[in-house]
C-alpha cells in the first residue's frame, strides 16, 4: 500500500508507540514520516506544526486523553478532517460507539495483529480518499 502519509502515533507508552511504528513499517504502509506524542496535548501541538494525514491515538493518557483530543481536533478547522483511529484496550460497546459518533473514524482493540491493523488502516485511508 503506497500512501505517502504523515502519521501521528499518540500513546503514553513508548513501547506501544514503537510497536505501532514497527507494524506500520512491517505491513508496508508507506509513511513519509511517523511522529509521536505522549498525550493529546502534545498531539495537538504536533498537529499545528506538521502536516499530519492520519492520527492513531490511545484513549487513556495523562494531561489530555484521546476523547478530549478528538473534541479539540473536530472543533478546529485545520484538523477537523484528519482521520483518527482510536487504538485502545477499551471494550465497552457504548464507549466505542460514542467515539465513532464523536469523530473517530475507526477503533482498533489492543492487543491486535498486524493483519487487523492493516485492515483497519486500509479501510480508514480508503474512506478518506473517497
Task: List where the protein language model places each region.
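C-terminal output helix
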Residues: 112-121
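Receiver (REC) domain active-site loop signature in two-component systems and cognate sites
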Residues: 61
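Two-component/phosphorelay signaling modules centered on CheY-like receiver
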Residues: 14-35, 102
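Active-site beta3 strand of CheY-like receiver
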Residues: 50-56
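Short amphipathic alpha-helix used as the core "switch/output" element in two-component signaling
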Residues: 45, 67-80
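Alpha4 helix (beta4-alpha4-beta5 surface) of REC/receiver domains from two-component response regulators
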Residues: 68, 91-106, 119
